Amino acid sequence: MYSFIRNCLFKLDAEVSHELSLDWLGAFERLHMLKPFALKVTPSPINVMGIDFPNRVGLAAGLDKNGDFVNALGQLGFGFVEIGTITPLAQSGNPKPRLFRLPEHQAIINRMGFNNKGVDHLVAQVQKRRYPGVLGINIGKNKITPEENALDDYVKCMDKVYAHADYITVNISSPNTPGLRNLQFGETLANLIAGIKQAQDRLAQTHDKYVPVAVKIAPDMTAEEIHSVADTLVNGNIDGVIATNTTISREAVQGHINADEAGGLSGLPVRDKSTEVIATLSAHLQGAMPIIGVGGIVEGADAQAKIAAGASLVQIYSGFIYKGPKLIAEAADAIASAG
């Protein structure tokens, strides 16, 4: 059934079909019609960052930016759902068109630019949620905020979402917000992490609960840069690292009609690069921090490969678009069967 729906949606503009599919998903949930789409997912409970996850397969940020579809997505079998990226103020993002499919490569290029309705809208939606599972909230900075003031935006978001999140992800790796990836390096990263940790400590006291913070990094780094980022995160007592975001490389899709579109490339072409980053992180961290692996999972074996490389959890997004909810069960089964 999903293949038929996907083929119909793929005849439309990519962003139109994205919005339409979410609207349908929400409608099906309200009408209690999601069961045919949700397969039985093999339980593989694990505790990561102090949180109990029912299985290791989560939804990556970006699909539900505003928290409008948490209840529906939560019924599909995910072990956790991450929403966002959200910013303090609503923003429209980059001009359209800004989302492109590469079906031959099971890939997507996006230059959305953190389009979202603002953190207050997301919090209002999350407060109404019926989904009882693990919820991550991914936060970013507004485009109009100068790079040197980025910490202010992250703290504003943390202040608003802390009470409602099971974990918070700090997104410093999207290629679609000018200067954002500069936050990943050197003293800039160290100062940002120190400020985020200070905010986390303050909020933990205020709310009498500890909400872990993970940092999402880019795949386009050398081994030395990955080591440096990892050391900064460990020294800053960050709770986890998500590897990776989209890539700006086009090596794997050269010749495709959309290959030269600006933005981040996700899906199958980023699979191996993401897994290599996970392996590099794992070898360097030696268990000092859990890794959440994301990037290019289009079948169960891809998810298991990321676990084997050192990830404790995995997330899917582009593969979910191409394969549908069955990928959740396939990934969870592959991980569980590998032990």
From Swiss-Prot:
Chain's gene name: pyrD
Positions bound to substrate: 65, 110-114, 171, 176, 245-246
GO BP terms: 'de novo' pyrimidine nucleobase biosynthetic process; 'de novo' UMP biosynthetic process
Function statement: Catalyzes the conversion of dihydroorotate to orotate with quinone as electron acceptor.
Swiss-Prot/TrEMBL keywords: Cell membrane, Flavoprotein, FMN, Membrane, Oxidoreductase, Pyrimidine biosynthesis
Gene Ontology MF terms in the entry: dihydroorotate dehydrogenase (quinone) activity
Stored CDD domains: DHOD_2_like (cd04738)
Record's bilayer topology term: Peripheral membrane protein
Binding site for FMN: 61-65, 85, 138, 171, 216, 244, 267, 296, 317-318
Family in the record: Belongs to the dihydroorotate dehydrogenase family. Type 2 subfamily.
Cystine connections: none
Subunit structure: Monomer.
Cofactor binding comment, as recorded: Binds 1 FMN per subunit.
Cofactor (UniProt): FMN
Intracellular or extracellular location(s): Cell membrane
EC number: 1.3.5.2
Biological pathway: Pyrimidine metabolism; UMP biosynthesis via de novo pathway; orotate from (S)-dihydroorotate (quinone route): step 1/1
Catalytic residue list: 174
Origin species: Saccharophagus degradans (strain 2-40 / ATCC 43961 / DSM 17024)
Catalysed reaction, written as an equation: (S)-dihydroorotate + a quinone = orotate + a quinol
GO CC terms, sorted: cytoplasm; plasma membrane
Name this polypeptide is given: Dihydroorotate dehydrogenase (quinone)
